[in-house]
Amino acid sequence: MTIFDSIALISKSSKSGLTSGNTTSKLNGITVGGNNVSSVNCGGCGGYTNNEPSLYGGNCGCN
């Protein structure tokens, strides 16, 4: 599975309600740019929570 396959899976999961937002890419599980709000893993972007900025921009938090 390539990084592009992973991004495609993330995009598809957004329609299931597990993840919402537009995650542009991930590097070692850290969101790089875009917005990623997850109802499964709070603080999934570099350990930040509740819509605080991620390490490389964008927002992370919980639904």
UniProtKB/Swiss-Prot annotation:
Q: What protein name does the entry list?
A: Protein sigN172
Species in which this protein is naturally found: Dictyostelium discoideum (Social amoeba)
